[in-house]
Amino acid sequence: MSSTLDSQHDLVAEKQSARTAPPPMYQVVLLNDDYTPMEFVVKVLQKFFGKNQEEATRIMLQVHHEGRGICGVYVRDVAATRIAQVAQYARARQHPLQCIMEPV
């Protein structure tokens, strides 16, 4: 009887652990291209990722020099939404700016 209670307790503890586990996180990465103006990249970082002028400029320079820069870390749905928003905003203004998401 004791082993039945122990296994039930383990099952309950396992379910509680599964419910409280944090969701997987994804980083949104902005990719460099040869056509999008630096000022536009700064504007995107401010508008869609809430960066101030200094942070946005730092990330933009990282993208420019290293080819990529991390805009933020979000749950999957939020990351996907930000990527779609940036793509739509950039395309509407005829810029080829791209973002991707990567698991953290």
Curated annotation (Swiss-Prot):
The record ties this protein, via SUPFAM superfamilies, to: ClpS-like
TM segments?
A: none
Q: Which domain of life is it from?
A: Bacteria
Q: Which cysteines are joined by disulfide bonds?
A: none
Its GO biological process annotations read: protein catabolic process; proteolysis
Q: Which PANTHER family match?
A: ATP-DEPENDENT CLP PROTEASE ADAPTER PROTEIN CLPS, ATP-DEPENDENT CLP PROTEASE ADAPTER PROTEIN CLPS1, CHLOROPLASTIC
* Function of the molecule: Involved in the modulation of the specificity of the ClpAP-mediated ATP-dependent protein degradation.
Q: Which family does it belong to?
A: Belongs to the ClpS family.
Q: How does it assemble?
A: Binds to the N-terminal domain of the chaperone ClpA.
Question: What is the name of this protein?
Answer: ATP-dependent Clp protease adapter protein ClpS
* Gene name of the encoded protein: clpS
